Amino acid sequence: MGGAADMRKKTKDRHSWKTGFTTGSCAAGAAKAACLLLKGLHQGTEVDIPLPQGERLQLPVHRWDRVEDVAWVSIIKNAGDDPDVTHGLEVVARVQLLSQRGEILIRGGRGIGVVTKKGLQIPPGESAINPVPRSMIQAAVREVFPQEEILVVIEVPEGERLALKTLNPRLGIMGGVSILGTTGIVRPMSEEAFKNSILPELDQAVAYGHKAIVLTPGNYGFKVAREQLMVPEEAIIQMSNFVGFLLEEAAYRKIEKVLLLGHIGKLIKVAGGIFHTHTHVADARMEILVAHAALAGMDQNSLQTIAELPTVEGAAEEIRSKGWGSLLFKLAERASHRAQDHVHGELQVGTAFTLLNGEIIAWDDPAMEIGKEFWHWPPVEEEFWRK
């Protein structure tokens, strides 16, 4: 086992690309720095915040000021080597002390989008500040004001203009950008750099003797694999958008079985034969879902309702509520068939779809068999949703 452990250390050392930080980290850092300013503490050029996974992050402060009982600070978004339209964006937090005891109230101001459609992580009518960034803001503020009632208003001065370059208008998020992030860190997704960093991880899985691995797009699937399926960390490969590439490389390394595990909005593309899942390359998620629903015999009104929903997750929940849960299982099966065809049958592939909350909502028989054989398959209400 020592050799494999050494390989893990070398693998991490080879990651030479630059990471960045999310808009969620910017908002949390600006909020904490503004609280320090409001409290009369020294305002330096950097601010230190806690991250969701227990690490800490130092962020450079861009501008700041205090007018009477309101303090504001801005931080410039740095996406590192990741190609991100929000790179260089100024994120502002304005804070005000309301009372000596109470909650932290988080609001979206100028340049923050407002959710207008259901099916997203934030309900309609609320500012598009996602749950993890909200938690990060609260944790950062509480390091300065442990129990006080604080109003935090997040603003992005260029948000309304920049939002037109994002998916927000299509998702029904109007008037600005979203505050996003699940870890606080932006990890580069440039193709060559990212692919080169993943291949040693596959080699590592082989060195550990794993005949089966999990391929997942990112952090959500990684968490499900670790916590629900009990998959060893070195057998979980975060593939980003490069499904076809990772399937080919896994087959080349004589790995026998692969579980595709991740959010339905990403992996449903594989059911349509899409093996590079970045939105700018191919985005037929809803079209694939509606087409298969029509082939299964769903009525026209239901098809119209599903097609008008802003996200695949919302559509999947609507499908389940209408008693068509079996369709999602068939789509998982279809994704596995397309994946196996992609590598000419050199791998056995199973597919499992999740929601953002980690619930496994659909899978095919190979996915369950791989899970039971190598790791753990959580008790789920299969027969209920297959109906």
UniProtKB/Swiss-Prot annotation:
HAMAP family: CbiD. Keywords: Cobalamin biosynthesis, Methyltransferase, S-adenosyl-L-methionine, Transferase. Belongs to the CbiD family. GO terms for biological process: anaerobic cobalamin biosynthetic process; methylation. It comes from the Bacteria. It catalyses: Co-precorrin-5B + S-adenosyl-L-methionine = Co-precorrin-6A + S-adenosyl-L-homocysteine. Pfam families: CbiD (PF01888). This is Cobalt-precorrin-5B C(1)-methyltransferase. Pathway: Cofactor biosynthesis; adenosylcobalamin biosynthesis; cob(II)yrinate a,c-diamide from sirohydrochlorin (anaerobic route): step 6/10. SUPFAM superfamilies: CbiD-like. Its EC number is 2.1.1.195. The keyword Transferase applies. The keyword Transferase applies. One of its GO terms (molecular function) is cobalt-precorrin-5B C1-methyltransferase activity. It is an enzyme of class 2 (transferase).
